[in-house]
């Protein structure tokens, strides 16, 4: 069992901890709790870089080793890092669990050392018709992020 964690930081009062676990070559389970967000859906992605020298802006684009267009987590055509949305309650908090087979913790496409990012707006899952739909899901600004690191 491989385990990883990302502690979210934000200049906007958002905080949270995201846990990643993977058994052998199976899918990765992502669980977490985030607080300080406005209610509603927020895009949730793994970005290519673990660079937070310029806050969340330096984490690069969505992790996309196959060079595909943006999509929903269940789509065949999607970035590996496209994890859809988290649905935040009226209290500004969300707890979630996601199982995904495109974000391994080991091997050449490992997400360890990359960043997880929470966006200001809903991810349209590549289906919104906006010019940014096929690249970012038109999910808006980056409100919180954290580097994914191995856990003991």
Swiss-Prot record:
Cofactor(s) needed: Cu cation; Zn(2+)
Disulfide bridge partners, by residue number: 56-145
Keywords: Antioxidant, Copper, Cytoplasm, Disulfide bond, Metal-binding, Oxidoreductase, Zinc
Manner of cofactor binding, per the entry note: Binds 1 copper ion per subunit.
Pfam families: Sod_Cu (PF00080)
Enzyme class: oxidoreductase
Location within or outside the cell: Cytoplasm
GO MF annotation, one: copper ion binding
GO CC annotations, alphabetized: cytoplasm
Keyword Cytoplasm in annotation: yes
Enzyme Commission no: 1.15.1.1
Residues that, per the record, bind Cu cation: 45, 47, 62, 119
Residue positions binding Zn(2+): 62, 70, 79, 82
InterPro entries tied to this protein: SOD-like_Cu/Zn_dom_sf, SOD_Cu/Zn_/chaperone, SOD_Cu/Zn_BS, SOD_Cu_Zn_dom
Catalytic activity: 2 superoxide + 2 H(+) = H2O2 + O2
Family per record: Belongs to the Cu-Zn superoxide dismutase family.
Subunit structure as annotated in this protein's UniProt entry: Homodimer.
Function of the molecule: Destroys radicals which are normally produced within the cells and which are toxic to biological systems.
Name of this protein: Superoxide dismutase [Cu-Zn]
Gene name of the encoded protein: SODCC
